[in-house]
Design a protein with these regions (language model features):
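Structured soluble/peripheral alpha/beta segments that form catalytic or ligand/cofactor-binding pockets
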Residues: 1-346
């Protein structure tokens, strides 16, 4: 039975176990890294942003993460029209909490990192998330060289987001605290090569995947997301499953006009031998019936024997129907988003 948490409180008890598992419409759990039990290398923390321009048919993503063994910094540019992706990443080893990622997604914070190839700065101030990231040497799908993004994502104070806190049946000291913030209207500029372009009002939307946890060694997950306008109203989806005990909380929800409309279990039906074929996504209550058509696979593979990762983040379009809890049926027609299959041994 899923459990909605409504009061703020500490995430972990003195033994390192979640005090109240469930889901919430706001980030209510107080995360303290020093309270995590089971070794610092098992702690995984990340801020992942994706901004998708529905009108101009492109997406950009930026990641800053502390995975214990290593810190990963990554930038990608997805061109839906050319069906191509450009990406660049960098690793540093044994960051162990030194990057400066925040202990709460709603606190004001600054985190920055740079090397000779990449530079990042994520700044949170009130209702605005200022993202500055660049890769001057990135060769884009159209042949131009260099990507420089300066975006502001607007997260209204009254907007709801989906936060879950769950643990693993086999190891209750292993936990996953995660917030997905959809439908953040994006402003700012993007420079591709020598061409700079201002985002137009309402054409681009951002999503934040804010994750903190103490993980078990091997996991596979599935995640799907989109943020757009449907009949001129902000609409989003966050769907996912695959790891930890989701009895008290799934991370499945419709975002509509900045409010959470909670869903139960969902299932992704796809050809594991060819992820570029259509995916069929449904829920058990009959509220979702979606076709996801991938157009490009942002894939990466890492194998250091002890640490192994295989990631397929597919960008494409969603079509189908979503039924709100009040009975209203919304029709989606080619809205851009993504779905992913990720395996990690870390």
């Amino acid at each position: 039975m899923e459990h909605e948490v409504t009061k703020k409180g500490l995430l972990l008890d003195a033994k390192g176990r979640i005090m109240e598992e469930g889901w919430a419409r706001k980030p209510l759990w107080i995360y303290q890294r020093e309270q995590v039990k089971g070794g610092r290398l098992r702690i995984k923390e990340w801020d992942y942003y994706a901004v998708i321009n529905q009108q101009k048919q492109y997406a950009v993503t930026a990641t800053m993460s502390d995975l214990g063994y290593a810190a990963l910094f990554a930038i990608s540019y997805i061109d839906f029209t050319r069906k191509a992706v450009s990406q660049k990443d960098a690793l540093t080893f044994f960051p162990l909490g030194k990057i400066g990622l925040s202990s709460s997604s709603d606190m004001d914070n600054e985190v920055a990192w740079a090397n000779k190839t990449l530079r990042f700065a994520f700044v949170k101030r009130g209702e605005k998330r200022h993202l500055m990231f660049a890769c001057p040497s990135l060769v884009l799908p159209d042949g131009s060289i260099g990507l420089d993004c300066d975006f502001v994502l607007n997260q209204r104070k009254e907007s709801e987001s989906l936060t879950i806190a769950t643990s693993w049946k086999e190891q209750r000291k292993a936990f996953y605290l995660n917030e997905k913030v959809n439908c953040m209207r994006a402003e700012g500029t993007i420079r591709r090569g020598m061409k700079s372009e201002q985002l137009l009002l309402g054409e681009a939307w951002g999503v934040l995947d804010w994750g903190r946890g103490r993980w078990t060694y091997q996991n596979t997950w599935y995640w799907a997301s989109l943020s757009a306008l449907v009949e001129n109203i902000p609409f989003g989806l966050n769907l996912g499953y695959g790891f930890s005990d989701r009895t008290p909380a799934s991370e499945n929800a419709i975002y509509y006009n900045h409010k959470i409309d909670k869903l139960g279990e969902v299932q992704f039906q796809f050809n594991s031998g060819n992820l570029m074929e259509q995916w069929h996504i449904q829920d058990k209550e009959g509220r979702l019936d979606l076709i996801f058509q991938p157009v490009v696979d942002r894939s990466s593979n890492t194998n250091f024997v002890v640490i192994k990762s295989s990631q397929h983040q597919l960008f494409g379009s969603y079509s189908g129907t979503c039924k709100l809890s009040d009975g209203t049926t919304l029709h989606l027609d080619g809205l851009l988003g993504f779905a992913e299959e990720v395996f990690n041994r870390w």
